[in-house]
Amino acid sequence: PQLRQCGDIDLYVGEAKYVLAHEALKSVVTEIDGLDEIYNDPKHFHAKVGAVLIEIHRFADIKEIPKLDALYQKYAADGFSRNLVPVELCGVSVMTPSDDFNTYYIFNHLWHHFLSAGIGLRQLCDLAVFLDTHDVNKTYLEEILTSMKVMKPWQTIGSILVDYLGLSKDKMPFYVPVSRRKQERIIRRILLEGNFGHSSRMG
């Protein structure tokens, strides 16, 4: 983890605690959006601790298509409230989504940023490590991937995890071979754009 390329920190608090989170953070951060600004973005507001950017989310994600968004919010509400998994970070127990929802969420997050801004290899590694170390509820995963209409992107990314990063096919649910040409197009874009498009902005 010490060698992992850093990103920002996403903290999900939900709608009910959104304003309370802003109040609680004011005294411990170096920068924070004003109270009158926290609803400017439909998903989150921003704070900083030194140079580290923190996004405090009332919604984990918002889909552009209303029907898909309504469906996603139902899955997210369940995934962020039931069977939560505690992870200890620097002596603090942090609750993370259920393993079942997290499988989808890690993929959803990287796919969203791949389409909108760019990702680094670290996001692919995150998903590969998670799949390698967790038992995946394939019935639930198939339901959510199919319902959210992202089974093909899942399989495309999955083929890269297997063929480029060495994830076992047995650990990659719904693995199907994908053409090397398609894989190379995606890898080339990842390497050119970099983490959240940083490489393309630099060059």
Where are these regions (language model features)?
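Conserved NTP-donor binding/palm subdomain of two-metal-ion nucleotidyltransferases/polymerases, i.e.
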Residues: 1-7, 13-203
